[in-house]
């Protein structure tokens, strides 16, 4: 069974249009998609920190493997790295950076206790970061939670083609196969907010 692609976004026009483009590209590849619009939590960091709470609600609602895909993304190829039945958690990272953070534009969670545990711990860590007014990104928090877990879920590190940013060059010598392209709408929204 293919995972259900899920996403939530804050409803700006760019995200509304983008999520429909993401949905269309995913459905053309045979994926089902579930999205929700949410109210802004006050900052980009706080909005991103809401991701594990949203994913937890999707786990309870759907009870099947899920893959978060950012609203500003387009799928170009089937997500073949997620078809292994033994993988419980999958995420990418930048191969040219120190291994201190994941890239959370695509996050896979199997329907297993171990993947639910990392999701719960990630949510707790994000809540603490937001309450403490930390500017730590959700992807850094996710990495720290995963690294500290005594018994982490069976993990697949995805190639950078799952989190390829449209205007960034390929990083390192890794095979250059683009599965998901990300358009970084938050950058455009921040620029527009500063200009007004």
Which role fits each region the language model picked out?
Residues 34-36, 67-70, 91, 154-159:
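A structural signal for short, well-ordered beta-strand segments and their strand-loop junctions
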Residues 19-22, 75-80, 161-164:
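Short, polar loop motifs at secondary-structure junctions
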Residues 12-15, 44-48, 97, 108-111, ...:
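Aromatic-acidic/polar surface patches that form glycan- and anion
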Residues 2-5, 87-89, 155:
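Hydrophobic beta-strand segments of well-ordered beta-sheets in folded domains
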Residues 116-196:
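Catalytic core and acceptor-binding pocket of nucleotide-sugar-dependent glycosyltransferases
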Residues 49-102, 106-116:
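GT-A fold catalytic core of metal-dependent nucleotide-sugar glycosyltransferases
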Residues 1-64, 113, 149-151, 183-196:
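N-terminal anchoring/stem segment of glycosyltransferases
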Residues 3, 104-105, 179:
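Residue-level detector of short, conserved catalytic/binding motifs and their immediate flanks
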């Amino acid at each position: 069974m293919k995972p259900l692609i899920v996403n939530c976004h804050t409803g700006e026009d760019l995200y509304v249009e983008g999520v429909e483009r993401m949905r269309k590209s995913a459905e053309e590849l045979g994926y089902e998609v579930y999205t929700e619009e949410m109210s802004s939590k006050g900052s980009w960091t706080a909005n991103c920190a809401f991701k594990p709470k949203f994913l937890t609600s999707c786990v309870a609602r759907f009870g099947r493997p899920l893959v978060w895909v950012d609203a500003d993304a387009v799928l170009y190829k089937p997500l073949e790295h997620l078809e292994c039945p033994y993988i419980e958690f999958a995420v990418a990272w930048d191969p040219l950076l120190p291994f201190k953070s994941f890239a959370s534009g695509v996050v896979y969670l199997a329907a297993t206790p171990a993947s639910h545990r990392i999701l719960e711990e990630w949510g707790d860590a994000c809540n603490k970061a937001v309450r403490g007014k930390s500017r730590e990104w959700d992807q850094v928090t996710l990495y720290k939670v995963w690294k500290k877990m005594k018994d982490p879920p069976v993990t697949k590190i995805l190639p950078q083609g799952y989190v390829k940013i449209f205007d960034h060059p390929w990083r390192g010598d890794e095979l250059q196969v683009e599965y998901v392209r990300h358009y970084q709408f938050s950058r455009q929204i921040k620029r527009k907010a500063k200009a007004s």
